[in-house]
Amino acid sequence: MRVEILSSKIHRATVTDANLNYVGSITIDEELMRAANLLENQKVEILDVNNGERFATYVIKGKKGEICLNGAAARKVCIGDIVIIVAYASMKFKKAKKFSPTIVHVNAKNEMIKK
């Protein structure tokens, strides 16, 4: 049996921009992507702590400190909102029981404070 399990999380990032006119995605600081083991174009779920929205999109590389929701997703957040960015992996149940996700904590400037 296979299960979906949390593989990566950026915890409590601050939305720095919302660009309605971009094609889509979430732009994430490249350093945070690397720390969280997120790949460009990888599917992620966005959880907005401020308004309760939950939605899926894909990742693109951004500049230092950047967390920007693009395209239609820009309507789901406000600049300054706190979001949790999560990715899941499908794995066999036995492996999932031993798996530890990568969790990156950030401060209000989207700087890594704990991994």
Swiss-Prot record:
- Predominant localisation class: cytoplasm
On this chain, the residues bearing Pyruvic acid (Ser) are S25
UniProt keyword annotations, A-Z: Autocatalytic cleavage, Cytoplasm, Decarboxylase, Lyase, Pantothenate biosynthesis, Pyruvate, Schiff base, Zymogen
State the needed cofactors, names only: pyruvate
Pfam families found in the cross-reference section: Asp_decarbox
> Molecular function (GO) terms listed?
aspartate 1-decarboxylase activity
Kindly tell me the pathway this chain contributes to.
Cofactor biosynthesis; (R)-pantothenate biosynthesis; beta-alanine from L-aspartate: step 1/1
Recorded hits in Gene3D superfamilies, A to Z, give: 2.40.40.20
Q: Which interval of the chain is the signal sequence?
A: none
Listed under GO cellular component are:
cytosol
User: Which residues are responsible for catalysis?
Assistant: S25 (schiff-base intermediate with substrate), Y58 (proton donor)
Subcellular localization, per the record?
A: Cytoplasm
Q: How is it modified after translation?
A: Is synthesized initially as an inactive proenzyme, which is activated by self-cleavage at a specific serine bond to produce a beta-subunit with a hydroxyl group at its C-terminus and an alpha-subunit with a pyruvoyl group at its N-terminus.
The organism's superkingdom is given as Bacteria
- Top-level class of the enzyme under EC nomenclature: lyase
The reaction(s) catalysed by this protein are: L-aspartate + H(+) = beta-alanine + CO2
| Binding residues for substrate | T57, G71, A72, A73
The record's Gene Ontology biological-process terms are: alanine biosynthetic process; pantothenate biosynthetic process
Q: How is the cofactor bound?
A: Binds 1 pyruvoyl group covalently per subunit.
EC number(s) recorded for this UniProt protein: 4.1.1.11
**Subunit record text:** Heterooctamer of four alpha and four beta subunits.
Q: Name the NCBIfam families on file.
A: panD (TIGR00223)
Q: Which family is this sequence assigned to?
A: Belongs to the PanD family.
HAMAP family xref list: PanD (MF_00446)
Role played:
Catalyzes the pyruvoyl-dependent decarboxylation of aspartate to produce beta-alanine.
Q: What is this protein called?
A: Aspartate 1-decarboxylase
Phylogenetic classification of the source organism: Bacteria, Pseudomonadati, Campylobacterota, Epsilonproteobacteria, Campylobacterales
Q: Gene encoding this polypeptide?
A: panD
